[in-house]
Regions:
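The feature captures the beta-strand-to-loop junction immediately N-terminal to the Walker
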Residues: 38-40
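Helix-to-loop junction immediately C-terminal to a conserved catalytic motif
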Residues: 53
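Conserved ABC transporter NBD signature motif
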Residues: 61-71
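Conserved ABC ATPase signature
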Residues: 128-132, 136
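A short, proline-enriched helix->beta-strand linker immediately N-terminal to the Walker B motif
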Residues: 147-151
């Protein structure tokens, strides 16, 4: 499944209070691509994902899907906040989307348990979310998104609230699951290292109103792991991205706008 954003813009409010958050966003994903989206705080990254997910209407432009995904929905969105249901146990949380699609009980539980095994949580299947750590709850959200079998997976800083060690583990787990299933992924992050480690390309956004500054191919072979971050190839690319995006971060920090991330 491929996705194209054609000239997406978004304005919140009206008249003198109108705020342009996104302006002329145009890009295409490739089949099975992992696309990292990187930009300063408040540039509209989360707004863009919500438009792609159909949760927000763009002020202008359109989102176009092409290709077939008969086994599942068009997209699934994983937020920074895990968004799991506290009254359901772990297995029922993962199986929820399949239940809504009418998948028979045994089939949905078998599929959900398989993904819980992949994220190391099968032994917690009957536990309630409050019994688990924040990192474990985010693993539940990731397992639920993949088992739902979306054509395109949208991830809005899913590791942003985690401690550094847990973040590294989940990055590695995500890479392994993605490698097995090759879903098209659009992954929003503030972290340059994360964008390079995970992505096939890195889409850089300007400060608000968010525009595409450039799209940089990563060009580092797979499979990847944390050790690649010490290679000259990785460090050179990291500096290349930082040199491109630094001025946008400085604009955001200086308060050239009063935007916030919607």
């Amino acid at each position: 499944m491929r996705l194209e954003c054609r000239c997406i813009s978004k304005i919140f409010g009206e008249g003198k209070k109108a705020t342009r958050t996104l302006d002329d966003i145009c890009f295409e994903t490739r089949e099975g691509e992992f696309l990292s989206v990187l930009g300063p705080s408040g540039c509209g990254k989360s707004t863009l994902l919500r438009i792609i997910a159909g949760l927000l209407e763009p002020t202008g432009g359109e989102v176009i899907y092409s290709g077939n995904n008969p086994a599942g929905p068009l997209n699934a969105l994983v937020f920074q906040e895990h968004g799991i249901f506290p009254w359901m146990n772990v297995l029922d949380n993962v199986a929820f989307g399949l239940e809504m699609r009418g998948v028979p009980r045994k089939e949905r539980y078998d599929q959900s348990l398989d993904f819980l095994k992949r994220v190391g949580l099968a032994q917690y299947a009957t536990r309630n979310p409050h019994e688990l750590s924040v990192g474990m709850r985010q693993r539940i959200a990731i397992a639920r998104a993949f088992v739902h079998n979306p054509a395109i997976l949208l991830m809005d800083e899913p590791f942003g609230a985690l401690d550094a060690q847990t973040r590294l583990i989940l990055q590695d787990e995500l890479l392994k699951i993605w490698s097995d299933h090759k879903k098209t992924v659009i992954f929003v992050t503030h972290d340059i290292d994360e964008a390079i480690l995970l992505g096939d390309r890195v889409l850089l956004m300007t400060s608000v109103p968010g525009r595409i500054k450039e799209v940089i191919p990563v060009g580092i072979g797979r499979p990847r792991d944390l050790r690649m971050e010490n290679t000259q190839e990785f460090l050179t690319l990291k500096m290349r991205i930082w040199e491109s995006i630094r001025s946008e971060v400085e604009k955001s920090m200086m308060g050239d706008n009063d935007e916030r991330e919607y």
